[in-house]
């Protein structure tokens, strides 16, 4: 069994070692040399260096290739178009994963090499310990035989020199003592022979250095491969996150990784070939490195340990053992004879010590015989050889393959990475810009621009009015593509808000204006001029003009009714008299003339708009109705084909597009401000269809307080203001009686015509204050949110209740108004070609000329006026009208398709004749009609005169009240 184990437990050369050993070994002159492992031979080391230079050559080639590629990229200054780097990123990711796998393989090979080297070192330590033990045992045996037994034998010989009677026994005693001494010498020589060759064997230095190198190599290799893994991870992160910085970092560090990988490949290749050469015949390497004192046969015996070979130390051990046995036998004879011959000498202890030393020496020889056996040394040799040539060499080869593959992959990765990051644009830094202002327009530079901005609303490209600008909250967003903005939770509140009108910047809740009502300094000047002209005109002329104007209006209304219904879209009404007592004005005829001229301009504009837009019906009331000759239309007129849609779906416009609706070139304007102001000032109520108006209610409502004096105080120079104020106070008492007379006459005529047109009257429905209160609260909240209301700064205390309101631009600079006289406009109106075709309104720039106060109107939410029953046949059946700025307002008629058209331009003679008739006509019914200082006078005349040079432009296509555009003073 032992022979079989000895036979099967032999070293076999691994296949990897054979392959590596088969590699050609060339010197510097490219001559093939012996491939035997000779680490101390320079030629052999030269051949290993040449083999290791192959990866170094590949390193140089790869670096040159990368260098040329980078040079071409650096020299290429052409702008690169947008290029898809998805394929490059995918390829780079795949190569990176493969490189990580190669690095992992290198880590596995490093662990195998580490384990193989540990086995070699462990086996070497065991062999070294065994040799040391044999050497120590032989040394102890030799010391015992030489230093302890031999001196005792010498002492015994001295004792035996004493004379004795039995010479024969004495001679036999000396012979046995000499045999003991001789055998001890033989045993000592045998032990010395065993120890002598082992004295030069010492692997302690080799093992210690091996431990040190392995302690550095293994963690160093792990750290290097881990660093490569980190670089691969950086590359993967850069590819995943499209990071230009990470890719550039890998490009720089990748060059170092490529260099290190190729250098490690060369080192591993040389080491692998060397270990392969060693593993072909490790015993021969041991023989070549064995000390000179160690015989070759001894080393080969221990490395091969063949059963047929004799142990070189066994013979000497056997000789030593035989010598000790002979010495012990002889010592026994000596003890027997000496004890008989020398009884009184005390030899017993000495003889016992010699026997004890001989026995210990024999035991040492027995142990030494077991130590010098080749089985233990051969086992350790096989363990070391297998650990190095099988596990260690395999791990080294794996590291060689891993480093070679990693070097190639890293070279590819660096090239692809360098080709990839040039197509990744650097991320643009965020520009340091100021936060945009939430006010969509800059503040006016001076007071004039502020006033122009306050009087003018922006228009869009179609000439229609754009929504107002409401600033003061940063939550207000710019208009989106949506056509409608649902701002309120309830439909009725939203409808009330839509009926309200637009707001200007910084307006108080009560300052609701229509887009076209541009009252301001220009209007104040026009009012003052009209007052002066009225004061200079005779009463007869004014009465004649007023009478002629009323007749012309009646004729025009009848012609309009015969042609097909109401014509104008925009109805301008005379303003209320600015003074509470019209009877104080004596020169009412002059004011009436001026008012007739102003009303003539409105008539021209109504005719133009009527011929462009045609006849429309009222969306709110479809029942046909008629208007009296002195009445005006206060409802919006909407095309008949859109009225059912609007009635069913409600107003499709948001609250920030109130009163402005464009459909097939038509503009529908509604205003809620007039009703609210009339209600707050105690003005007239809106008549309904089914409630007859009360005469007492009509007469007890006073006109609104005067605003003429306030405008004169604010906008006129001090001298002009004082003169104008004195004239105004002198004329108040004279004009009041005449104006009252003309107003009664005008009211009788309107009631007669209204009784003919409308046989049925309705009761007066008081204006509801619920909707007015909601509108006022909404306006107040908007006013609180205004930035101008807070002194140009946003006040966080006020929470805006309206979101998503559009912020259109307001014209920054107002151009100078174009001067056109009223006579030029009259001439243009006469030469204009009228057309009954429905046309889109002309594109008009924002009004930049002096404006006149258009007439006060009603609101679209009030029902149409009823037809009053005949109160008195003696006065011609004049119905009780509604006082609305001095004119009887007919919010609706009996026929929706029949409307009174505006009168044609009056001639001067006709104007005077009309005013004469109006002055002579008695007030039969005794009703006083307040209309701004004269029956039918427009703009609250009576406080001044209108010059011919003053410009009175046509009003823009919208309906407004007399409220002023206000700019809150900061």
From Swiss-Prot:
Disruption phenotype: Flies lacking tty are viable and fertile. Was named 'tweety' after the cartoon character that cannot fly. Indeed, a mutant involving a genomic region that contain tty leads to flies that cannot fly.
Ranges of compositional bias, category Basic residues: 572-587
Topology, Extracellular side: 1-47, 111-219, 268-395
Biased composition (Pro residues): 852-868
Positions with biased composition (Low complexity): 532-571, 689-700, 707-737, 745-759
Topology feature Cytoplasmic, residues: 69-89, 241-246, 417-970
Protein family per UniProt: Belongs to the tweety family.
Name of the featured protein: Protein tweety
Key words, A-Z: Cell membrane, Chloride, Chloride channel, Glycoprotein, Ion channel, Ion transport, Membrane, Transmembrane, Transmembrane helix, Transport
GO MF entries: chloride channel activity; intracellularly calcium-gated chloride channel activity; volume-sensitive chloride channel activity
Biased composition (Gly residues): 883-894, 931-945
Primary localization: membrane
Glycosylated position list: 27, 34, 136, 166, 183, 359
Membrane topology: Multi-pass membrane protein
Compartments where located: Cell membrane
Keyword Thylakoid: no
Example GO BP: chloride transport
The gene coding this protein: tty
Location of the region described as Disordered in the Swiss-Prot/TrEMBL record: 532-587, 677-763, 849-970
Function: Non-essential protein that probably acts as a chloride channel.
Transmembrane segments: 48-68, 90-110, 220-240, 247-267, 396-416
Compositionally skewed regions (Polar residues) per UniProt: 961-970
């Amino acid at each position: 069994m032992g022979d079989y184990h000895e036979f099967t437990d032999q070293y076999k050369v691994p296949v990897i070692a054979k392959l590596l050993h088969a590699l050609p070994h060339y010197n510097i002159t490219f001559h093939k040399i012996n491939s035997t492992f000779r680490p101390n031979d320079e030629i052999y080391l030269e051949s290993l260096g040449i083999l290791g230079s192959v990866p170094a050559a590949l390193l140089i080639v790869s670096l040159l290739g990368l260098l040329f590629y980078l040079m071409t990229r650096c020299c290429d200054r052409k702008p690169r178009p947008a290029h898809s780097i998805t394929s490059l990123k995918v390829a780079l990711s795949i190569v990176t994963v493969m490189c990580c796998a190669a690095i992992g393989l290198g880590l596995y090979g490093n662990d195998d090499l580490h384990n193989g080297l540990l086995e070699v070192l462990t086996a070497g330590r065991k062999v070294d310990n065994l040799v040391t033990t044999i050497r120590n045992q032989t040394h102890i045996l030799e010391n015992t035989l030489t230093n302890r037994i031999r001196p005792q034998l010498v002492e015994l010989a001295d004792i035996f020199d004493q004379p004795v009677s039995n010479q024969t026994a004495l001679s036999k005693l000396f012979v046995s003592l000499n045999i003991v001494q001789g055998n001890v010498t033989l045993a000592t020589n045998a032990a010395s022979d065993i120890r002598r060759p082992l004295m030069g064997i010492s692997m302690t230095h080799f093992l210690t250095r091996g431990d040190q190198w392995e302690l550095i190599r293994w963690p160093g290799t792990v750290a290097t491969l881990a660093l490569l893994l980190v670089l691969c991870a950086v590359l993967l992160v850069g590819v995943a996150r499209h990071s230009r910085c990470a890719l550039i970092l890998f490009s720089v560090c990748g060059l170092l990784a490529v260099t290190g990988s190729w250098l490690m490949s060369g080192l591993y290749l040389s080491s692998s070939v060397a270990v392969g050469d060693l593993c072909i015949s490790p015993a021969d390497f041991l023989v070549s490195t064995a000390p000179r004192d160690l015989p070759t046969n001894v080393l080969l015996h221990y490395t091969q340990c063949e059963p047929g070979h004799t142990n070189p130390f066994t013979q000497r051990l056997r000789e030593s053992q035989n010598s000790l046995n002979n010495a012990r036998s002889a010592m026994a004879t000596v003890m027997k004879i000496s004890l008989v011959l020398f009884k009184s000498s005390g030899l017993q202890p000495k003889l016992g010590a010699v026997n004890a030393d001989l026995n210990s020496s024999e035991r040492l020889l027995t142990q030494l015989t077991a130590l010098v056996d080749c089985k233990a040394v051969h086992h350790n040799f096989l363990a070391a050889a297998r650990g190095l040539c099988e596990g260690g060499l395999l791990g080294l080869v794996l590291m060689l393959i891993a480093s070679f593959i990693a070097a190639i992959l890293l070279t590819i990765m660096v090239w692809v990475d360098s080709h990839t990051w040039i197509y990744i644009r650097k991320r643009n830094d965020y520009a340091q810009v100021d936060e945009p202002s939430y006010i969509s327009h800059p503040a006016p530079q001076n007071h004039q621009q502020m006033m122009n901005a306050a009087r003018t609303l922006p228009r869009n490209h179609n000439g229609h009015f754009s929504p107002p600008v409401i600033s003061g909250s940063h939550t207000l967003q710019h208009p989106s593509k949506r056509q409608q903005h649902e701002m309120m939770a309830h439909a009725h509140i939203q409808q009330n808000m839509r009926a309200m009108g637009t707001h200007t910047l910084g307006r108080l809740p009560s300052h609701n204006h229509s887009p076209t009502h541009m009252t301001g300094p220009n209007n104040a000047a026009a009012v003052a001029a009209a007052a002066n002209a009225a004061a200079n005109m005779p009463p007869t002329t004014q009465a004649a003009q007023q009478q002629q104007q009323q007749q012309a209006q009646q004729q025009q209304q009848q012609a309009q009714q015969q042609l097909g219904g109401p014509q104008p879209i925009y109805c301008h009404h005379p303003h209320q008299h600015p003074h509470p007592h019209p009877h104080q004005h004596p020169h009412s005829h002059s004011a009436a003339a001026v008012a007739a001229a102003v009303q003539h301009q409105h008539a021209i504009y109504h005719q133009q708009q009527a011929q462009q837009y045609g006849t429309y019906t009222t969306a709110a009331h479809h029942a046909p109705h008629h208007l009296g000759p002195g009445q005006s239309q206060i409802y919006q007129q909407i095309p008949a084909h859109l009225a059912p849609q609007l009635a069913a779906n409600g107003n499709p416009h948001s609250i920030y597009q109130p009163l402005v609706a464009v459909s097939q070139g038509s503009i529908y304007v509604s205003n809620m401000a007039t009703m609210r102001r009339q209600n707050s000032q105690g003005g007239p109520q809106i008549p309904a269809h089914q409630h007859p108006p009360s005469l007492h209610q009509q007469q007890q409502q006073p006109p609104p307080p005067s605003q003429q004096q306030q405008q004169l105080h604010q906008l006129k120079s001090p001298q002009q203001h004082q003169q104008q104020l004195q004239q105004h106070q002198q004329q108040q008492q004279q004009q009041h009686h005449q104006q009252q007379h003309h107003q009664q006459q005008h009211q009788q005529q309107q009631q007669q015509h209204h009784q003919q047109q409308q046989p049925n009257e309705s009761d007066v429905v008081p204006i509801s204050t619920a909707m007015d209160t909601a509108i006022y609260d909404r306006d107040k909240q908007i006013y609180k949110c205004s930035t101008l209301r807070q002194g140009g700064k946003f006040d966080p205390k006020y929470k805006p209740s309206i979101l998503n309101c559009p912020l259109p631009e307001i014209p920054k600079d107002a151009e100078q108004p174009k001067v056109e006289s009223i006579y030029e406009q009259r001439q243009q109106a006469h030469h204009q070609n009228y057309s009954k075709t429905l046309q889109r309104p002309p594109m008009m720039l924002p009004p930049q000329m002096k404006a006149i106060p258009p007439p006060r109107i009603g609101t679209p939410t009030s029902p149409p006026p009823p037809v009053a029953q005949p109160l008195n046949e003696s006065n011609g059946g004049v119905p009780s009208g509604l006082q609305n700025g001095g004119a009887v307002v007919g919010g609706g008629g009996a026929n929706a398709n029949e409307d009174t058209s505006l009168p044609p331009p009056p001639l001067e003679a006709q104007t005077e004749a009309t005013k004469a008739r109006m002055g002579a006509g008695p007030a039969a019914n005794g009703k006083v009609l307040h209309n701004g200082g004269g029956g039918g006078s427009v703009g609250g005349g009576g406080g001044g005169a209108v010059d011919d040079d003053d410009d009175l432009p046509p009003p823009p296509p919208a309906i407004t009240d007399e409220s002023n555009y206000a700019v809150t003073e900061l």
